[in-house]
């Protein structure tokens, strides 16, 4: 096999050894699997997963990736957002589920040469630069949350806010490098709202009433065209509290617009943290479910809608009414409660259009 050259990136779950040593194996294994799956899901397109190594993910890239640091920071935030949803979703009192928040993430980035070998039907990689990258996981950086970059890696990526550092590796020598502290990035993951919008939180609200039962309204929302473009989040009001329509991450939404794709399952088997990506007008709008309750009398679901230059929370309440049922929609721009945050004027119009479609579908079902 020819010698290849590129970026070597390792993501390591910090604190996992202590976590697994002091908790129940079956649940700690499930938790690690979900976290590693989250890392793999949000891997930048220019990185290729070379191997899953216990509590670490190992990527390679032979492409120029100047924005790698920004991508890894996003990955760190996504990891901690997932941890938060896992904590919110679990009802298990075991030590593993109760202490999942103690885990965190660190990265090592190096650039060097390696050789790909095919062994027993699988690719394996060898080379002194791979050894170096893995040895750097055990280091003297005064943190558990960081990106450690060798000077070889720094020559090909953009990295601001670095702290100079060096490590001495036995049989290799002194390695000049730098690290970026990530602890402050936790705030971005914890800033996302996890509660429904109260009436006083809403910057805009609208209500539709239907001369039909809650179940009939749900049936109408299952109609392929009821919610229209960008309306996949309405399915979260009528679907049971399992992954949307029973779908798996990476699949299209059953019965929905073909531009809607379920990209991430909910945490710990719930719907919390579930993501739908809406591809519309060349843009991608992320719809992340942050809270949901449902029974035969109604539903409440709050979605975080993240698009180009906007971030909006939408709480939808489907409930019984004296004349049948009603849907109330509340909207607020992030950060909620900040007088400076402005709700894009088009959002209320889009929501009202969706509600009009649902009303038409309910009426059509009643005439059938």
Q: Where do the protein language model's features map onto the residues?
A:
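Hydrophobic pocket/interface hotspot
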Residues: 217-221, 227, 243, 276, ...
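Hydrophobic ligand-binding cavity/cleft-lining segments
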Residues: 194-268
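Short beta-strand segments that buttress and anchor functional surface loops
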Residues: 272-281, 300-307
């Amino acid at each position: 096999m020819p010698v290849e050259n590129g970026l070597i990136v390792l993501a390591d779950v910090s604190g996992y050894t202590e976590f697994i040593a002091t908790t129940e194996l079956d649940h700690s294994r499930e938790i690690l699997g979900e976290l590693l799956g989250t890392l793999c899901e949000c891997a930048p397109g220019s990185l290729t997963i070379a191997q899953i190594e216990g509590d670490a993910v190992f990527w390679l890239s032979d492409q120029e990736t100047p924005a790698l640091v920004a991508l890894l920071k996003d990955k760190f935030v996504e990891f901690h957002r997932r941890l938060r949803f896992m904590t919110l979703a679990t009802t298990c009192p075991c030590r593993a589920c109760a202490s999942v928040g103690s885990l965190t993430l660190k990265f090592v980035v190096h650039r060097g040469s390696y050789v790909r070998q095919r062994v027993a039907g699988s690719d394996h990689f060898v080379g002194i630069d791979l050894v170096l990258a893995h040895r750097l996981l055990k280091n003297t950086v005064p943190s558990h949350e960081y990106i450690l970059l060798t000077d070889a890696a720094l020559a090909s990526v953009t990295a601001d806010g670095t702290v100079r550092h060096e490590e001495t590796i036995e049989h290799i020598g002194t390695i000049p490098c730098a690290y970026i502290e990530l602890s402050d990035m936790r705030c971005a993951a914890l800033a996302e709202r996890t509660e429904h919008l109260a009436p006083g939180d809403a910057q805009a609200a609208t209500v539709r009433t239907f001369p039909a039962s809650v179940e009939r309204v749900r049936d109408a929302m299952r109609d392929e065209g009821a919610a229209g473009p960008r309306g996949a989040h309405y399915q979260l009001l009528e679907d049971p509290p399992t992954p949307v329509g029973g779908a798996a991450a990476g699949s299209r939404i059953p019965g929905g617009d073909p531009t809607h794709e379920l990209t991430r399952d909910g945490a710990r088997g719930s719907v919390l943290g579930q993501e739908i990506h809406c591809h519309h007008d060349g843009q991608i709008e992320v719809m992340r479910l942050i809270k949901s309750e449902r029974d035969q009398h109604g539903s409440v679901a709050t979605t975080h809608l993240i698009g180009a230059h906007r971030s909006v929370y939408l709480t939808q309440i489907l409930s019984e009414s004296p004349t049948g049922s009603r849907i109330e929609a509340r909207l607020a721009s992030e950060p909620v409660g900040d007088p400076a945050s402005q709700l894009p004027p088009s959002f209320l119009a889009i929501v009202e259009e969706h509600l009009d479609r649902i009303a038409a579908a309910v009426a059509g079902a009643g005439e059938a």
